[in-house]
């Protein structure tokens, strides 16, 4: 996931727009104390007052729709890398202003590996690293309650389709994660034989691949207790679900 500098041409008739910082982010990504203290820090750096407008989203596609169709003029947003690629392609981003006042420019310290991965989403004559700064990265996998599930059972994605887990599984309400889970499971043998890669599967949007993923998701449906983007952490800690296909950051919450 990456933070992105973003600014549209919309204005504000009642307040000077340059004195407002509009942020659109995932829940729990910025400590509330940081948001409260930032205007004072900004004034120390620049001598200018600043007000923050902070909004959160829980699904990448909803965030993109609000910006693209709602013409929301956020300054900073924090989508996943595949959404960055779409935003660049749609000309929704502006280059990052690297004038950080008295604070050093830390962007060159980004890991070369992460920078390389980020720039794989670049567009002709546009390097993604000029528009986005990596915020965090992680993996998706199976979080399980060991009161009900053994580590051995959780060691294979078969567990998501096992009928003994009927109504006990939470899945991420994310198109990319749901599609990826289904299509990877459907091609488990080919992956084991190294005749196809995960990247190839994730980028296969052919009618045949979509139909196969749909079939696998329908087979999984009886086991699903709900589709979540944020509440899975709490449900798992309260023993209301046995298994959560989730992001690594949520898993360590």
Please place each PLM-identified region on the residue numbering.
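Cysteine-centered motifs
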Residues: 2-3
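C-terminal motif of bacterial Sec signal peptides marking the signal peptidase cleavage site
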Residues: 6-9
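Short, well-ordered beta-to-alpha junction loops that form the rim of enzyme active sites
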Residues: 26, 81, 140, 174-175, ...
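A ligand-binding cleft/hinge motif common to bilobed small-molecule-binding domains
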Residues: 83-86, 243-253
């Amino acid at each position: 996931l990456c933070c992105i500098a973003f600014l549209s041409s919309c204005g504000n008739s009642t307040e000077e727009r340059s004195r407002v910082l509009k942020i659109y982010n995932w829940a729990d990504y910025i400590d509330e104390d940081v948001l409260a203290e930032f205007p004072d820090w900004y004034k120390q750096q620049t001598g200018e007052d600043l007000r923050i407008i902070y909004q959160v989203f829980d699904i990448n596609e909803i965030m993109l729709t609000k910006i693209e169709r709602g013409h929301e003029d956020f300054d900073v947003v924090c989508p996943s890398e595949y959404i960055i690629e779409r935003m660049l392609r749609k000309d929704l981003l502006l280059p990052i202003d690297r004038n950080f006042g008295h604070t050093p420019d830390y962007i060159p310290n980004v890991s070369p590996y992460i920078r390389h991965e980020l720039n794989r989403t670049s567009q002709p004559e546009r390097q993604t690293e000029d528009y986005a700064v990596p915020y965090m990265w992680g993996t998706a996998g199976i979080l399980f309650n060991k009161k009900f599930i053994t580590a051995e059972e959780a060691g294979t994605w078969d567990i998501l389709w096992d009928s003994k887990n009927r109504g006990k599984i939470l899945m991420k309400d994310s198109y990319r994660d749901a599609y990826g889970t289904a299509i990877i499971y459907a091609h488990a043998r080919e992956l084991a034989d190294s005749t196809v890669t995960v990247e190839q599967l994730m980028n296969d949007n052919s009618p045949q691949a979509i139909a196969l993923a749909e079939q696998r998701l329908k087979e999984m449906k009886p086991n699903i207790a709900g589709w979540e983007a944020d509440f899975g952490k709490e449900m798992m800690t309260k023993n209301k679900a046995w298994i959560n296909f989730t992001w690594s950051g949520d898993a360590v919450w």
